[in-house]
């Protein structure tokens, strides 16, 4: 979900998702007809609600809380950024989740789930009674005002309606720091007269 637009480059926005969605995949070396094949990099693509595809690069990841912030090119400024809530979730309050479990998603269609915040569990993760399946990871949990209070990163296969999110404070801190880093990188490129449409795939010296 788009959480911020760049103040440096008009066609760059920031999308928040789960950290494991941004991890580099490991591929074994392959030899075909005597030629060694190596994977050079992973490309990322974000698909909007309207079905448009946008190139993306990783700005930052937090492995402890399983968070990732992407820089995305070409998102319209008419698309409103979804803010991080000023206050975290409260026990017994209903929250909403927009997700694509099992990849069930189409142009102009996104599944909406609802459930209640139940408190902290295990290693301090925020726990919700929201249905999750593979494909739900990285989807936002919203309050009634449409503000982000959580990000689904895991569930329990044996329990239908349990969703885990990084603790709320970790999300707001991560987004603030990662956004600042992404904007700093763009500012450096801008002042080097570099092509900022390449986003942070270019690393300023």
Residue ranges and their predicted role:
Residues 1-18, 26, 57, 67, ...:
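N-terminal activation segment of mature serine protease catalytic domains
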Residues 2, 131-152:
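Catalytic nucleophile loop of clan PA
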Residues 2-6, 24-36, 57-61, 71-106:
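Active-site substrate-binding loop(s) of clan PA
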Residues 3-63, 154:
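Catalytic-histidine neighborhood of serine endopeptidases
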Residues 13, 17, 56, 70, ...:
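Terminal peptide-recognition signature
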Residues 65-72, 124-130:
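Short, solvent-exposed secondary-structure boundary/capping segments
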Residues 77-126, 131-136, 152-164:
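Flexible, gly/ser-rich surface segments that form the specificity/activation loops bordering the active-site cleft
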Residues 122, 142-205:
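C-terminal subregion of chymotrypsin/trypsin-like serine protease catalytic domains
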